Amino acid sequence: MDQANRKPEFRFEANEYPLGPGLRLLEASAGTGKTFALAHLVLRLLTEGGRQISQLLVVTFTESAAAELRSRIGKRLEDALKGLESFQHQSAFNSPDPVLDQWLLQQGSNSSKRNQWICSLLEALEGLDRADITTIHGFCRRTLRRQALESGAAVDPRLDRSEERRVGKECRSRWSPYH
């Protein structure tokens, strides 16, 4: 491919990515650090963004990916908490990666923010098991359950995998008034 037809490269900077309102899509090839980036963005949303873990929705494709995300987010929050606490006690903390080191240097020196963020991270870690870190299907299932009372739908909806049964029922409902 010649230079004229090349797409410009986008380098994702986890500490610079905007946190403003709206949807975010993180899309990249396998092994490029999506889980790492998401875990760091969750950290930033909980601290810099002032969000609570219950306000976030993290969706992926498979159960194993959701479990890995939950684990990595928890680890990231724990590492950030240790780093912020080391600033509080003026002791050295070597984080496991340069992105977290940079974040701690940029953000950790402000003592009023730091104390607030320590509390926020502790609360987030306590609520991590209940956080919306799920698959697309899990998100839909949970949304249907939450909306069941308002919509009058079943509280625990089941997916009808029988195409014939569904088509037959639909045909009978449409044709029965005429026969």
Language model: regions and residue ranges:
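Ser/Thr-centered flexible coil motifs
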Residues: 11, 160-161
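Positively charged, low-complexity/disordered segments
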Residues: 164, 168-179
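P-loop NTPase Walker
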Residues: 1-150
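Short hinge/gating elements
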Residues: 149-158
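Extended hydrophobic/Leu-rich segments
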Residues: 1, 163-164
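Conserved AAA+ ATPase "SRH/arginine-finger" region at the nucleotide-binding site
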Residues: 133, 159-160
